Amino acid sequence: MAKSNKIFTNTLRLLALAATVVAIVFMVTSHDSAQVLNLTFTAKYSNTPAFKFLVIGEAIAGGYTVISILLSFKGLFWRLIVILDMVTTVLLTSSISAALAIAQVGKKGNTHAGWLPICGQVPDFCDYVTIALIAGFAAAIIYFVLLLCSLYVVLSPIFVATP
């Protein structure tokens, strides 16, 4: 792999790592409470399985990112990198999708099910979740670009080879 391509992919991996760390930090620290009819309502990420899934997915992606930066992959190992980049991209996409669905219900509610929006009562919680979702989307997009770069590295010899 060319040195410029290695620098580019490592830079993208560092950006992805930063995005996953930001998503984890903001999601884990998202909590707020409100007083409703003399009852204290506390909103925190650990109350929702989808938000836990986001944190776990981002943590796995961040761990894989650190490993992929530290190890030097050459030759046949790039095929493994393509597979792991694809798995990471799918994991990030699914975890962000699940968290976004729950965040949408929290923000807008669901009149058909009788669920009221909660962001009016716990705005700090919703703001932190929004930042975590934005960072999670950034990580997923960066990993999609990394997947395309990895595919290019693996497949370019096939298309460039002369008969």
UniProtKB/Swiss-Prot annotation:
The chain crosses the membrane at residues 7-27, 53-73, 80-100, 129-149. Keywords: Cell membrane, Glycoprotein, Membrane, Transmembrane, Transmembrane helix. It comes from the Eukaryota. Residues 28-52, 101-128 are extracellular. Glycans are attached at residue 38. Its main location: membrane. The keyword Ribonucleoprotein does not apply. It is a multi-pass membrane protein. Residues 1-6, 74-79, 150-163 are cytoplasmic. It is found in: Cell membrane. GO terms for cellular component: plasma membrane. PANTHER family: CASP-LIKE PROTEIN 1U1. Homodimer and heterodimers. Belongs to the Casparian strip membrane proteins (CASP) family. This is CASP-like protein 1C2. The lineage of its organism: Eukaryota, Viridiplantae, Streptophyta, Embryophyta, Tracheophyta.
